[in-house]
Design a protein with these regions (language model features):
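Hydrophobic transmembrane helix bundles of membrane-integrated enzymes that assemble
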Residues: 1-265, 327-418, 422-426
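Long extracytoplasmic/lumenal interhelical loops at the membrane interface
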Residues: 143, 273, 277-345
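Aromatic-rich transmembrane-lumenal/periplasmic boundary elements in polytopic membrane proteins
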Residues: 235-293, 299-305
Length: 429
């Protein structure tokens, strides 16, 4: 479809594969991992583009930074096999997600109108997912994929399978909603309600702060230096007040971990509210192990898979979630991104990833005058980053696809002539 000019339809199919068939069709029905299909899609179109266009890979900062990070990933794969002795099958299973960054070269061939249309269709999909998620929360009946894990909390049921696309589209619904009147308000309300239903306190707090920031931003409050200073002072007082208890508990947790006091962690499972002590200890245990390896502390300990013979033979961490076999997950965790970073990437790789990540934020900040979608991208990236201590979303490369969509859209002269429709009808302007 992409090769025959049907780029919008092709993009929707790609996102269908990228985000677990929109959580509507179980993976066992499809027969393959949908993420693998998304990777094959991108890899095929990337190779096709290289053969068709002479200027397919532009000489710009985006290419340089993406290329630098992918070069590190390629080197890490070689290091994993020839230095650590990890099998190629494990390395490919772990490292293949990074090929999704090649989608930058695929999406830059779309014009703004095609991108806007694709996002509008995906927005409708997310609203349908959100409606089904709300039904889950009120009935306790699993509808979307991965709904097996849930708990009753008060009059509601706490499910963890909120759509990964929702983190972007909740801001899109508020600030770039393509619909009018009733449909605009109803879709916005559904999106906002859904973001609170997983009942993650850190996610809820981060969203509220970024929501307020976004409202002030689109109303140009920050254009006045005086108002900006007053606002920042108020936010500082608010954040300081809210975090007083959290800070005290955090220092107690860190002191316990440093003293080797893990007694409170013995019964921590997904069925209970994971404490910050658990997350700090999870990171601390893996960080200190990484520092003991002269190569690993800089370049990571390799691309091994969870539960493999190599992993079981080389790691014996005490802190982690209990797996199906009654053991402890050594590498993967949904509770914190940084534990995975230090194991997989080491210090150098983590720094390179952060350079890539904050490049996106700076890029969209620079072009914020070209459309509110830039503000949406920044808020989305900040949400993922601020929740990195309580989730693994920052490590998921598929979460970077949305920022990659609009990169170069304001730099290519022919594309600058396109009229950006349905992107700036902000409800708070």
């Amino acid at each position: 479809l992409y090769m025959y000019g049907q780029k919008v339809s092709s993009t929707i199919i790609f996102f269908f594969f990228l985000f677990d068939s929109f959580q509507l069709i179980p993976e066992k029905v499809i027969g393959l991992k949908t993420l693998d299909l998304a990777i094959i899609y991108i890899l095929f179109l990337f190779i096709w583009g290289l053969c068709k266009y002479k200027d397919y890979i532009p000489r710009n900062k985006s290419t340089l930074i993406i290329g630098l990070f992918l070069t590190f990933i390629f080197f890490e794969m070689l290091l994993s096999h020839f230095h650590y002795g990890i099998s190629w099958s494990e390395i490919i299973r772990t490292g293949r997600q990074h090929l999704l960054l090649l989608s930058y070269f695929v999406f830059r061939r779309l014009d703004k109108e095609e991108i806007n249309q694709s996002l509008k269709i995906l927005f409708v999909v997310v609203i349908i997912q959100s409606f089904l998620f709300i039904i889950q929360a009120f009935t306790g009946v699993g509808i979307l994929n991965n709904s097996e894990l849930f708990f009753k909390k008060g009059n509601l049921f706490r499910f963890y399978n909120i759509s990964l696309m929702h983190y972007f589209f909740v801001f899109y619904a508020i600030f770039c909603n393509p619909f009018k009147s009733f449909y605009k308000w109803s879709t916005m309300i559904i999106a906002i309600i859904t973001i609170f239903l997983p009942m993650h306190r850190s996610l809820s707090m981060a969203f509220i702060l970024l929501f307020v920031l976004g409202i002030l931003w689109v109303n140009h409050v920050f254009n006045s230096v005086k108002r900006t200073i007053i606002l920042l002072c108020c936010l500082f007082v608010l954040i300081t007040t809210v975090s007083t208890y959290i800070s005290i508990r955090t220092m107690e947790d860190i002191n316990k971990v440093a003293a080797g006091d893990y007694q409170e962690l013995e019964d921590v499972k997904l069925s209970s509210e994971s404490t910050f002590l658990f997350r700090v200890a999870h990171f601390y245990e893996r960080y200190t192990t990484m520092l003991e390896d002269n190569v690993g502390k800089w370049l990571g300990l390799g691309f091994m898979t969870e539960g493999s013979p190599y992993t079981e033979a080389h790691f014996d961490f005490m802190i982690g979630l209990e797996n199906e076999d009654g053991g402890i997950d050594q590498i993967d965790t949904p509770d914190i991104s940084w534990s995975i970073f230090v194991i997989r990437y080491g210090i150098i790789g983590t720094i390179l990833f952060l350079i890539l990540y904050f490049y996106f934020i700076v890029y969209y900040f620079r072009y914020q005058s070209h459309g509110t979608i830039c503000i949406v991208m920044i808020l989305y990236l900040l949400l993922i980053f601020t929740t990195s201590l309580t989730s693994d979303l920052l490590y998921k490369i598929n979460m970077l696809i949305f920022p990659l969509i609009y990169i170069d859209q304001w730099e290519d002269p022919p594309k600058n002539k396109m009229i950006q429709k349905n992107i700036d009808n902000d409800i708070f302007k």
